[in-house]
Swiss-Prot record:
Keywords: Nucleus, Phosphoprotein, Proteasome, TPR repeat. The lineage of its organism: Eukaryota, Fungi, Dikarya, Ascomycota, Saccharomycotina. It comes from the Eukaryota. It comes from Saccharomyces cerevisiae (strain ATCC 204508 / S288c) (Baker's yeast). The keyword Repressor does not apply. This is 26S proteasome regulatory subunit RPN7.
Length: 429
């Protein structure tokens, strides 16, 4: 009876359109400005885009943060010193007049939204109306890049009697603030709260959105195995256009899938994925990672390193989530392809192996030496004879020991079960 009364008191919440706040494209383009390996042309376009969006979306707090903190602390000074880069600072230079103009617009809009909240509370309007008013104000703070006020204001709507689904929407908006500023500790905390809410009553659509959010978080913190599972699954159910684009999700799924999936799954879930195939012709980043994936799967070693370098430049470096993992990814993909080639041989000459990859013997010798000492590759180099000898573990011996171990475990369980049965029988007597 109590449950029925509680449910009747909860205000029915009509799901609103999920607004794209903050604008993830602004954050992604701003990241490009800090990368000296990105072309001058790309950074110029990024600067123009960011400034246009700052003006359009009245982002005074973000504009100040961008110019006085982000670009100063994240490497804009590392730009190449050529005749073009001398003017680069001018593209994103702090303009006090523009900032003051944006601040006035912010103050006017915030005042208007606060007055609506005050009127609703004075008129003792329903919980739903008050909650939506707080959400509107919080989303405006999110839009302009005011993280602290956005979180605090959106949090006030959670205290209203709104549905679990509505609360999940609010928490996902708060989580997007963390993605926008690439604060993954913040994101982790908020997504844990979202997951708790979903377990209490999240619908199918919100569960799928959470899957995408958590998948990108896993990508950002280098949990590629979990990211691959979530992002590959998200391809068929993606709706989180407020967080990222479908093209980006496809690229992330391809990167993590290539890194973690075995050959059979790689073929079915990535190479032959209809969702990915439909985007390749129009998505440059996806073309690079797809070419790398196919070269590995088809053992096309001659084209593997060129595609790996292309992926590094076109996919990893420009991505704010993958950039910090770029060198790690390239290193591990070299190890993976070496292991795949050596799997087919007991011995192989360094010259033949170097020729297969289109590199020098000296480079290959040095590169293999990075993986062999710590057993990341099961082989040794015989420099006297110029060959690589594999020393893979004896699979049959390993299988035998595993069988014995599993048999012992089964025998122990059967003995315990037998003792329990005998005890039950004696009790009955």
């Amino acid at each position: 009876m109590v449950d029925v009364e509680e449910k009747s008191q909860e205000v029915e919440y009509v799901d609103p359109t999920v607004n794209r706040v903050p604008n993830y494209e602004v954050s992604e383009k701003a990241f490009l400005l800090t990368q000296s390996k990105v072309s001058i042309e790309q950074r110029k376009e990024a600067a123009e885009f960011v400034l246009a969006k700052i003006k359009e979306e009245e982002m005074a707090p973000y504009y100040k943060y961008l110019c006085e903190e982000y670009l100063v602390n994240n490497g804009q000074s590392d730009l190449e010193h050529d005749e073009k880069s001398d003017s680069l600072n001018e593209w994103i230079k702090f303009d006090q007049e523009l900032y003051n103009e944006l601040c006035k617009k912010n103050e006017s809009k915030i005042k208007e939204l606060n007055e609506k909240i005050q009127k609703l509370e004075e008129d003792d309007e329903g919980e739903l109306e008050q909650a939506q008013a707080w959400i509107n104000l919080g989303e405006y703070y999110a839009q302009i890049g005011d993280k602290d006020n956005a979180e605090k204001t959106l949090g006030k709507s959670l205290s209203k009697a709104i549905s679990t689904g509505a609360k999940i929407d609010v928490m996902l908006t708060i989580a997007r603030l963390g993605f926008f500023y690439n604060d993954q500790l913040y994101v982790k905390e908020k997504l844990e709260a979202v997951n708790s809410m979903i377990e209490k009553g999240g619908d199918w659509e919100r569960r799928n959105r959470y899957k995408t959010y958590y998948g990108i978080h896993c990508l950002a913190v280098r949990n590629f195995k979990e990211a691959a599972k979530l992002l590959v699954d998200s391809l068929a159910t993606f709706t989180s256009i407020e967080l990222t684009s479908y093209e980006s999700i496809a690229t992330y799924a391809s990167v993590t899938g290539l890194f973690t999936l075995e050959r059979t799954d790689l073929k079915s879930k990535v190479i032959d994925s209809p969702e990915l195939l439909s985007l390749i012709s129009t998505t440059a980043a996806l073309q690079s990672i797809s070419s790398l994936t196919i070269s590995l799967y088809a053992s096309d070693y001659a084209s593997y390193f060129p595609y790996l370098l292309e992926t590094y430049a076109n996919v990893l470096i420009p991505c704010k989530y993958l950039n910090r993992h770029a060198d790690f990814f390239v290193r591990e993909m070299r190890r993976k392809v070496y292991a795949q080639l050596l799997e087919s041989y007991k011995t192989l000459s360094l010259k033949s192996m170097a020729s297969a990859f289109g590199v020098s013997v000296a480079f290959l010798d040095n590169d293999l030496g990075k993986f062999i000492p710590n057993k990341q590759l099961n082989c040794v180099i015989d420099r006297v004879n110029g060959i690589v000898e594999t020393n893979r573990p004896d699979n049959k011996n390993a299988q035998y020991h595993l069988l014995v171990k599993q048999g012992d475990g089964l025998l122990t369980k059967l003995q315990k079960y037998g003792a329990a049965v005998r005890l039950t029988g004696s009790d009955r007597v």
